[in-house]
């Protein structure tokens, strides 16, 4: 492995980008980052070869390109930006595009005919396999997987199914923050601004202009941090959706088990009634006027039941008893909530860290203080009087100012002073 810096990216972009997006990159024998290396420069002698991960630029879902100057199903005019391509001889470095189109992730593989099945197994694609005769000996093929690619973690059949409903919308929102959809990528705009500010900063000799450029860089970094915070908020909403769905499933399981128990009880009682000796019914049938006496008893039982029901309704309609029932229900629900909130029954590891004002381990739902320097950081919902996660920022009782959404002015001032002195 050789660790290099890609020559096709500006210094500012190399500083900010990740390892596979323009920064110092580990590749096998070539001086390009994974994002720019669209070809594994392998000839018939197999000098380079091997398999490397990369990000390929091109429209999503392009069709194969074979021996033509244009894509079959995409808008680009260069074979370098197609989903599949083969080429001989390899293009020069200057022909490799940097950016443009939509991004997919894929895997480059040598494809000699004797081993094409192995290459297909290692680099699985959601496309129909092509015959190895389509490609010449020693050529390569690039596979573009649109969307999310778990690099080195199994084939496309192992991927999770698409989520439905609100969870799908949250996934799409997180994806839009990263790569956009029908618009410029937010992080690309930030990188462009950083690049321009860096170039102007390096050319400037005036101290005031240099400070202005530094402020521009600071604003761009703040924007990137806001994008990261927004993604974290989306992920927390997704976690909340999953937890709500889990609670719904648990409640449905409890109802299903209760219905099963009721059904089993009713079946046992019916079986016991069927096993009664039939002699009693035969003896009653042999008695004279048994039918008439049974009808009279049924009428009397119905009248008694209706009178008792009316009496119960009148008694239960008094406001005092209604109030007593309501208070009993509230007490029961409060005791149940306290039992659920208490972690006394949970096995506690002595080495586990403690949180919150109660200085106990983490359990149930917790919320984090938005003060980065908060000594406690995480709090139980029940300890800070929360029933659900509040919108926007939230500060703990030790860090808040006038309300829970504002930070204490003294703490905020000291925080700014420490940031300024760094």
Swiss-Prot record:
Recorded GO terms, molecular function? histone H3K4me3 reader activity; methylated histone binding; zinc ion binding
Q: Which cysteines are joined by disulfide bonds?
A: none
Q: Which PROSITE patterns match?
A: ZF_PHD_1 (PS01359), ZF_PHD_2 (PS50016)
Q: What is its main location?
A: nucleus
SUPFAM superfamilies for this protein:
FYVE/PHD zinc finger (SSF57903)
Q: Where in the cell is it found?
A: Nucleus
Tagged with keyword Ubl conjugation: yes
Which residues does the record give as Zn(2+) 2 binding sites? 369, 374, 396, 399
Q: Where on this chain are zinc fingers (PHD-type) annotated?
A: 353-402
> CDD domains in the record, alphabetically?
ING_ING1, PHD_ING1_2
List all Basic and acidic residues biased stretches: 297-314
**PBR: region residues:** 405-422
Implicated in which disease? Answer: Squamous cell carcinoma of the head and neck: A non-melanoma skin cancer affecting the head and neck. The hallmark of cutaneous SCC is malignant transformation of normal epidermal keratinocytes.
- PANTHER family named among the record's database cross-references: INHIBITOR OF GROWTH PROTEIN, INHIBITOR OF GROWTH PROTEIN 1
Q: What does the subunit section of this Swiss-Prot or TrEMBL entry state?
A: Interacts with H3K4me3 and to a lesser extent with H3K4me2. Interacts with TP53. Isoform 2 interacts with RSL1D1.
The record's comment about this protein's domains reads: The PHD-type zinc finger mediates the binding to H3K4me3. The polybasic region (PBR) is responsive to the binding to phosphoinositides (PtdInsPs), including phosphatidylinositol 5-phosphate (PtdIns(5)P).
Q: In its UniProt entry, what is this protein called?
A: Inhibitor of growth protein 1
Q: Could you tell me which species this protein originates from?
A: Homo sapiens (Human)
Record gene name: ING1
